[in-house]
């Protein structure tokens, strides 16, 4: 919000000017996160229609008001750093701000505060920072149970963090100012939104934001209604059965939530679960406020799982793809011109389908051929063949972005864990709520390999040539992503006592494959839980925090943070020389 100059017009009196210095407060509180061009809102009364209308126009108050200029040195300092560094600093500041609230006992439940006081559980500031980074990056990894540890205020704070982080803080700001106030957006804010959730075509950024954010907000409202009815009427929820909830062998599947009230028939609890689950599904964050087992109590509720997959797909497909689909559907109307879908949308959707099918087939292959009695397919607790097949489909799709689980990942084979780690490493679409190296990156690398095999010098797709700069960027993103995952696995493995609490034979035993799974889950902003996060040391949690932030920003943007703000002029060109490769 900015300094508003409100002009009250009448026939007899002169305009009365009143200034609301809201921007100074917002600047000091959030370091000018919400800063845009100064503009005036003129409210006048029409003599003919007797309606109040407003006209939003830019004005040069900043040059005239010296008192305001002295508060802008922080903003100008950030602005000189460049767009990428500005976004990075704001993300870090917001993450620390959220962590302070989550560490504040006012957000905790009474039982959780008592447990901390009696040293029954440990909750350090690193845990709060980890949870804040996981929420704002739309990951979903957590060292503690949200349902048991945080009250309604704490859960609402986490949900808002997920929503703002998923839509994008700058994107949401531009959407509000553009849609509600009709304000014009300056070049700097356009660059912020283009980097955060825009497309390669900067001219379409404002349109993409308006269409995509509106679509996601409408979807959020619709899915909230759907999930409310499901939670209210679902007969499949497994809650509060004390005898069934007890599991003497932790290696077997047990979907029951102990000491949790079933939301069936409780509209207030159903609505609260639905709002939280809708926000996390749309924004591809694997959080839940049901209990400590994600969606395991609804293992047999296929309607909940299907709508969860649809919501996760809408949020993870990306802002440019949503805009393309909207324009394509709108072009079928007779009054609208024909619209050509971009190459980015085609590559994203085709790669998503292709990778999902490959991952699904490999998962079925490895699980059905397993001879381990504790493996997923061989446990009778998972029900019929149809129930197991649907669970495989759900888990394979959620590894692409959302991270919800209806099964215990500990029961999957080592081969399946590796496949799902690769799926999380790939992620979903660029400019979306998902993470990873993104689908378009994999598509470009795959097309370059195919071009080399068939002897083509150009990388083409759908009668379009992919530039060498995009190919080099895709290879760099892939290589740096592999490097980050390897470094993350080494640090987490060397600083974590994996089986500190696993003494008895019937308890879970973790190894390197589980570490790899968690690191890929953090990098892909997936948040699929493995139950190993509480065993991580402070160094391991900080490593995952860094990986989650990089997964949200994207590797190209992270590289530019440490680069020069100005492009260097290469006046000297050297002679080419071939180098033997392979």
PLM features per residue range, with description:
Residues 1, 5, 11-18, 24-33, ...:
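Membrane-proximal intracellular helices of multi-pass ion channels
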């Amino acid at each position: 919000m900015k300094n508003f100059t409100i002009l009250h017009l009448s026939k007899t009196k002169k305009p009365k000017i009143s200034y609301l210095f809201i921007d100074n407060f917002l600047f000091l509180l959030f370091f000018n996160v919400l800063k845009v061009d100064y503009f005036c809102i003129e409210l006048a009364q029409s003599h003919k229609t007797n309606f109040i209308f407003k006209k939003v126009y830019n004005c040069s108050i900043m040059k005239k008001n010296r008192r305001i200029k002295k508060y802008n040195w922080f903003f100008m300092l950030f602005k000189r750093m460049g767009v990428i560094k500005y976004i990075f600093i704001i993300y870090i500041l917001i993450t620390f701000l959220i962590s302070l609230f989550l560490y504040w006992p006012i957000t905790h439940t009474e039982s959780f505060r008592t447990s901390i006081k009696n040293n029954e559980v440990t909750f350090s500031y690193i845990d709060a920072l980890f949870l804040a980074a996981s929420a704002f990056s739309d990951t979903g990894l957590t060292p503690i149970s949200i349902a048991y540890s945080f009250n309604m205020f704490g859960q609402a704070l986490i949900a808002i963090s997920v929503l703002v982080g998923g839509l994008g803080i700058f994107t949401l700001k531009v959407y509000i100012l553009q849609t509600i106030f009709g304000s014009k957006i300056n070049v700097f804010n356009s660059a912020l939104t283009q980097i955060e959730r825009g497309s390669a075509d900067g001219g379409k950024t404002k349109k993409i934001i308006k269409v995509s954010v509106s679509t996601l907000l409408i979807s959020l409202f619709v899915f909230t209604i759907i999930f409310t009815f499901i939670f209210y009427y679902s007969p499949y929820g497994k809650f509060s059965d004390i005898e069934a909830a007890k599991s003497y062998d932790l290696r077997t599947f047990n979907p029951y939530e102990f000491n949790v009230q079933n939301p069936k028939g409780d509209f207030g609890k159903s609505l609260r679960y639905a709002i939280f689950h809708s926000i996390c599904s749309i924004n591809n964050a694997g959080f839940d406020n049901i209990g400590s087992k994600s969606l395991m109590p609804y293992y047999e509720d296929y309607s909940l799982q299907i709508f969860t997959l649809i919501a996760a797909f809408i949020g993870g497909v990306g802002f440019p793809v949503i805009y393309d689909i909207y324009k394509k559907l709108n072009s079928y109307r007779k009054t609208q011109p024909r619209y050509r879908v971009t190459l980015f949308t085609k590559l994203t959707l085709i790669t998503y389908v292709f990778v999902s099918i490959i991952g699904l087939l490999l998962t079925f292959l490895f699980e059905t051929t397993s001879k381990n009695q504790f493996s997923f397919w061989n446990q009778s607790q998972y029900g019929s063949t149809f129930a197991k097949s649907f669970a495989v489909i759900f888990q394979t799709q959620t590894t692409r972005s959302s991270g919800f689980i209806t099964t215990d990942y500990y029961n999957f084979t080592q081969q399946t864990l590796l496949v799902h780690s690769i799926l999380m490493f790939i992620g979903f679409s660029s400019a979306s709520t998902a993470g990873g190296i993104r689908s378009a990156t994999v598509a470009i690398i795959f097309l370059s390999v195919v071009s080399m095999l068939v002897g083509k010098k150009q990388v083409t797709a759908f009668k379009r040539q992919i530039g060498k700069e995009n190919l080099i960027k895709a290879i760099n993103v892939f290589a740096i992503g592999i490097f980050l995952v390897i470094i993350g696995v080494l640090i987490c493995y060397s600083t974590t006592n994996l089986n500190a609490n696993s003494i008895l034979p019937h308890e879970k035993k973790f190894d390197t494959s589980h570490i790899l799974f968690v690191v890929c889950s953090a990098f892909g902003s997936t948040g699929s839980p493995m139950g190993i996060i509480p065993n991580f040391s402070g160094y391991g949690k900080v490593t995952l925090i860094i990986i989650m932030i990089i997964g949200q920003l994207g590797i190209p943007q992270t590289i530019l943070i440490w680069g020069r703000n100005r492009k260097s002029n290469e006046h000297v060109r050297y002679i080419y020389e071939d180098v033997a490769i392979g």
